[in-house]
Structure formats: structure tokens, C-alpha cells
Design a protein with these regions (language model features):
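Extracellular adhesion/carbohydrate-binding repeat motifs centered on closely spaced tryptophans
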Residues: 1, 7, 11-170, 226
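Short amphipathic beta-strand/extended segments with alternating polar/hydrophobic composition
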Residues: 7, 67, 131, 189-202, ...
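Soluble periplasmic/extracytoplasmic beta-strand elements of cell-envelope proteins
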Residues: 19, 107, 152, 172-174, ...
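A mature extracytoplasmic/lumenal domain signature
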Residues: 24, 44, 71, 92, ...
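A generic structural motif
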Residues: 122, 185-187, 237, 298
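A short, compositionally biased
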Residues: 125, 140, 175-181, 229-230, ...
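Cell wall/extracellular polymer interaction/catalysis modules
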Residues: 155-219, 231-232, 314, 318-323, ...
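Exported/periplasmic cell-wall-interacting domains
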Residues: 207-210, 219-333
Length: 333
């Protein structure tokens, strides 16, 4: 293209968000104009673009930028975008580091978003950390109360989700039907969570009843509807409905090698006729450690992140293996 013609067209295209360089080429990618930086859409051999980004966050060459309403990139300091705060240096959004804002410790995540408090590392693995408000990083090798709840953190800063070796009972149990989580507490006030269990409660047509009840140990192989059998049955006394139990995923026979894989994979979602299903290892633990414990069955507030479903998150499902006809947590196999 003739440079003089391009400069003439530039006045028209500039108003539409395009820019021609002095060479006559359409601006693409990160471009500096009159001391300010902009990012233009990148063109390819198959498609010509080139419009400037405005009022948005832009990912360019593995870095984040924030474009103003006129397209120029914000240079430095704190910027609010879409309700969140970001910190910039030389136009680049800073990521994966600790930063104080107004004297308060926080963390800039992988996308640069400033957050305080909990940082989710993995929903799939139920891994979270907590930004220590009194330090310069995550809480490590310590316990601390957050909103009245006592948490423990390991040397890597991860929330510890099983403290039953430290707290050996008596326990208090709470089941959240909405989030599919059973949380075991070391105190009656339920401020010291010590174990999280992934559960399936009743389907909408056969709901697990809400209320306050008591757990009592029942049978090693619990007869259920069908007929079928669940391992390590613990009765929810007073819940009615012909008998509500905590038990493992039911099998067609009273042995460990006829597990219905489809039902096992539903753990964490409503699936039962009213009972509270768990994996075998957790059913066994409740059977052995919660005889006589109070249990409260509630509808909690829905949480989108599994790691935040309950104070200790939602325990990850142990994947099936081998012939997939047995519970992988079953100590008998």
C-alpha cells in the first residue's frame, strides 16, 4: 500500500479503532504510539484484523494488560476492572505473588486478580491455602481461626482436611444436602472441623430428612431396599422414613466385589432413597468413631467451588480401578 494513501486512510480508520504505521502497515499486537502503548488485534494470513482493544483485559504473549476506554494501556499501580483489583508494572498485570493493598496482605493470582483470605489451588484435589493477614505469605505450620472456625495448615500452607489423629472424639456431625458434604467436628459448637466426607443424599423424590438426630452403630453389612446391602451401616436415629442410615454404596450381594460403578461415581450428588452414602473407608470410620454422636442435616448455601463446600471442602472422589467392581477405598480388597 502507498504510504501517503495509508496515512490518509489512517485518519478514517483511527476513528474506527485501527492504526496505520508510518510504513503503511496496519498496527498489530503491542504497539507504541506517541509515548502510549496499545494492543491491536493480531492478523493472520487467513484473516485481517487490527482493531484496538478498549475497556478490557487483554492476554498477549502470555501476559495480561488492561486497556482504557480509549485503548491506551494503563501503566502502573492499582487498577479496578470488572469488580476486581489488579496491580500493574510497565503496563503488565502482575501475577502469582503477594502484594499489600492499603496495608492488607493479599495475593495476585495467575490472572492477576488481587484476593485476600482463601486461595483455591485445586478443586479436583480439594487443595486451598489461606493468606496470613499477619505475615507475608500463606499461613504455614500453624492453626488460626477464620470467621470463628479453627483451621490447621501444613508446612506447605495447605489446609489440613483430616485432623482425627489430633482430635479423637467425641464428635459432632453435620451433613449439608446442598453441597454433598459431611463435616465432622471435634466440638459441639462446631467450630473445630476435623474431617470431611463426600456424600450422596436422597434424590428429590426421596429426600434425606433435615433436622437434628443421633447416630448409632448398626450392622457391618446393612440390609437395604432391593434387597441390597451397604457396608458399615450407622443408623440416623429419629429420622424416620423406615430407617435412614449412613452406609457405603449399596451392592446386590453382601460382598465387596459387586459394586455398581455408576452409583459409586455419583458420590457427592443426590442419588439415594434417603440414606447417606459414602465410600467404604468413610462409612467404616463413621461406624467405628461416631456411635452416639449428634448429627445435624441441613441445607447449606450452594458453593460453586468444591474446595469451599464446607469448612474443609468436598473430599475428592477416589477413582475406580481394575475391574471397577469394588470400592477402591475398601480395606477388605
Amino acid at each position: 500500500r502507498d504510504p501517503e494513501m495509508s496515512r490518509g486512510l489512517g485518519d478514517v480508520y483511527k476513528r474506527q479503532g485501527y492504526y496505520f504505521k508510518p510504513s503503511g502497515k496496519l498496527a498489530s499486537g503491542l504497539t507504541e504510539i506517541d509515548g502510549k502503548k496499545y494492543i491491536f488485534e493480531s492478523s493472520t494470513s487467513a484473516e485481517h484484523k487490527g482493531k484496538v482493544y478498549k475497556s478490557t483485559m487483554v492476554r498477549y504473549k502470555k501476559k495480561w494488560y488492561i486497556a482504557s476506554s480509549k485503548g491506551s494501556l494503563y501503566k502502573s499501580g492499582w487498577r479496578k476492572y470488572s469488580g476486581n483489583y489488579y496491580y500493574l508494572k510497565e503496563c503488565v498485570v502482575q501475577t502469582n505473588q503477594f502484594m499489600k493493598k492499603n496495608g492488607v496482605n493479599g495475593y495476585l493470582d495467575a490472572n492477576g486478580k488481587y484476593t485476600r483470605g482463601w486461595v483455591i489451588v485445586s478443586n479436583a484435589k480439594n487443595l486451598v491455602r489461606y493468606i496470613d493477614p499477619s505475615g507475608n505469605g500463606f499461613a504455614r505450620n500453624k492453626s488460626m481461626r477464620v470467621n470463628g472456625i479453627l483451621y490447621y495448615f501444613d508446612r506447605n500452607g495447605y489446609r489440613i482436611t483430616d485432623l482425627t489423629n489430633r482430635y479423637r472424639g467425641p464428635y459432632s456431625v453435620q451433613v449439608d444436602r446442598v453441597n454433598g458434604v459431611m463435616t465432622v467436628y471435634a466440638d459441639s459448637a462446631r467450630t473445630i472441623p476435623v474431617k470431611t466426607i463426600r456424600v450422596s443424599v436422597g434424590l428429590a423424590g426421596t429426600p434425606t430428612p433435615t433436622g437434628n438426630f443421633t447416630l448409632s452403630r448398626s450392622l457391618r453389612w446393612q440390609p437395604l431396599m432391593g434387597p441390597s446391602w451397604g457396608q458399615y451401616g450407622t443408623h440416623v436415629d429419629g429420622a424416620g422414613q423406615g430407617g435412614i442410615f449412613v452406609h457405603s454404596v449399596a451392592c446386590g450381594q453382601a460382598n465387596s466385589y459387586n459394586l455398581p460403578a455408576v452409583e459409586y461415581n455419583k458420590l457427592g450428588s443426590p442419588a439415594s432413597h434417603g440414606c447417606i452414602r459414602t465410600c467404604v473407608a468413610d462409612a467404616k470410620w463413621v461406624y467405628e468413631n461416631c456411635n452416639g454422636a449428634p448429627i445435624s442435616i441441613i441445607d447449606g448455601k450452594y458453593k460453586a467451588d468444591d474446595a469451599m463446600k464446607g469448612p474443609l471442602g468436598k473430599k475428592a472422589l477416589t477413582p475406580l480401578r481394575g475391574a471397577a467392581n469394588f470400592d477402591p477405598t475398601d480395606p477388605a480388597v
